[in-house]
Structure formats: C-alpha cells, structure tokens
Amino acid sequence: MNQQTELKDSSNESNPTRFGLPRQAIKEIQDALALYPEVEKAILYGSRATGTFKPESDIDLTLIGENLTHNHLLGIMFDLDDLLLPWMIDLSLLDTIDNPGLREHIGRVGQTLYER
C-alpha cells in the first residue's frame, strides 16, 4: 500500500502546498513513481524542501530503492517528462550521489514526497 505525503487540505486543487506546487502536480508525480515497484521512497530536497523556492524553481528529487537502476531512472524521467509539468525535475538515485555535501544536504533538509 502506498503512503503519500499528507498535504494541506484545500478545496481548491490549484492552491500550492508548502513545497510551492499544486496538489494535483504532486499527485501526478506520486502516481508516476508508484508505477515502479523498485522506488521505495522519493525525497524532495533543495529550495522546494527548504521553503526558499521561487515559482520557477526546479523540483529536486532523489530516489531510494534497493533494486533501482539507471534504466529505471531513465524510464521514470521519461514518465515524469510526459506529465508536461511547467517545472524541470532534477532526478537522481541517492545511492549514486558521490558528493558528500549534497548527501548531507539531502539528509538535513530532505522531505519525503513519496513512500511505498
């Protein structure tokens, strides 16, 4: 069963969440990730996680999953691109990030956007 990040309740679907993204956009991203059983968790980091985003800020996501490969990453990237969202999505696999500063940043400010 999927557990998805609880978002602010709002009667207007276009109201941004605390990540500065409409509820519908987050749901579409979560639904795309749910198509891949290898994705155990998706962590949002960067300006959208810290609350310092601008309307045009990208969406920084790193994926966690024991069996995730670069081929999965490519498929997910294509599926997210097909959503035609107005933001660039910077997608990575946490296990392949070599930059210790970036890993520390993700650990410190990362917010769970999706969890299987």
Summary of predicted features, one role per range:
Residues 60-63:
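Short beta-strand->loop micro-motif that forms the acidic, two-metal-ion catalytic signature
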Residues 45-47:
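Glycine-rich beta-strand-to-loop/alpha-helix junction loops that act as flexible
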Residues 1-41, 50-55, 66-116:
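Catalytic core of pol beta-like nucleotidyltransferases
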